[in-house]
Regions:
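Carbohydrate-active catalytic/glycan-binding domains of CAZyme proteins
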Residues: 1-322
Length: 322
């Protein structure tokens, strides 16, 4: 349920996307005004032109979605593993600002990898992704693209091989305090999952690992109810506070087999920056967050919205909500 979260804020509204794998409509989209209550919006990829899922097997299709906003447009970038293609779908708010209109024509990017991320700077567009390099090793790589066409202008170039954990992936780039920060996931999406971070003075590196890596994980705390913490994204609220969203599971063990009935879920944690590095929820991926420890963050959650409820008995041709 709602894995691989990515969140962007536009004005006072937060938009979140999640992976949907082999199911239509592809790319789950939700909206919130308070970060606590989320309204599900129509899925983004609803046509074959946007994402052809006809050959997708279980757990293939759309995964590792990222949403960004730049110069009046939403940009959602993702991988369709069934086609093994990476692409962008562009959208914009309608006239009364109540819905996003998504373009049917996607922008394909010719990279050999998965988990793409978008970063905009000085009217230039950069894509970070994970893929294999010579020797069969996985690495976070980067290309500069022409946004309208997806054509590659520079790269791919390696940014990081991670900290040594398996399957370095899920990259996101952000700029803070005059430096570039590369967020990544390592260890696979199972029990070894962890969030790591790297810092560079240039967008093209070199990137140095945080001294406290892994930045956020429960891989060595098997007693914690939340496990498999990883695949994170960072964003700011309306008051300028930083937050981290990531995936996690609440597993049960039956006959020595770990079972997650709700799959990978979306989690949200407050972030505080030290002089150089972010600290996520005091460093602990806890099931609950004591907001008394984060008075500035709690102010952003002080006006919860009321969401309408609905019931559908599946007796008509259309489903509620539309």
């Amino acid at each position: 349920m709602y894995p691989d979260p990515s969140i962007v804020r536009v004005g006072d509204t937060y938009y979140m996307v999640n992976s949907t794998f082999e199911y239509y409509p592809g790319i789950a989209l939700s909206r919130s005004f308070d970060l606590l209550n989320w309204e599900k919006l129509p899925g983004i990829a609803q046509t074959i032109e946007q994402a052809d899922l006809r050959s997708a097997k279980s757990n293939e299709g759309i995964f590792a979605v990222c949403i960004r906003y730049n110069q009046g447009f939403f940009y959602v970038i993702t991988t369709n593993f069934a086609e093994f293609k990476n692409f962008i779908i562009r959208g914009y708010l309608n006239e009364d600002q109540t819905a996003i209109i998504w373009e049917n024509q996607r922008i394909e990017i010719d990279i050999f990898g998965i988990d793409p991320d978008l970063y905009f700077e000085d009217n230039r567009t950069y894509v970070q992704f994970t893929g294999y390099v010579e020797g069969g090793k996985k690495a976070i790589q980067q290309v500069e693209i022409e946004l309208e066409t997806g054509n590659i202008l520079r790269g791919p170039e390696v940014l990081s091989f991670g900290t040594g954990g398996r399957d370095v992936e899920g990259p996101h780039i952000l700029k803070e305090k005059g430096a570039y920060y590369l967020l990544a996931a390592e260890g696979g999406t199972g029990q070894g999952h962890m969030i790591t971070m790297f810092k560079g003075e240039s967008l093209w590196g070199p990137f140095q690992p945080a001294p406290t890596n892994p930045l956020f994980t429960n891989r060595d705390r098997a007693e914690e109810p939340l496990q498999n913490i990883g695949h994170a994204d960072l964003f700011q609220d309306t008051l300028g506070n930083w937050w981290l969203t990531c995936l996690g599971t609440r597993p049960a063990t039956i006959d020595h087999i770990q079972i997650t009935n709700l799959g990978r879920e979306t989690l949200l944690y407050p972030v505080e920056w030290t002089e150089e590095w972010p600290v996520i929820n005091k460093g602990i991926p806890s099931l609950e967050v004591d907001l008394a420890d984060f008075p500035n963050h709690s102010q952003a959650l002080s006006n919860p919205q009321n969401l309408s409820k609905f019931t559908d008995y599946f007796i008509s041709e259309q489903l509620d909500p539309e």
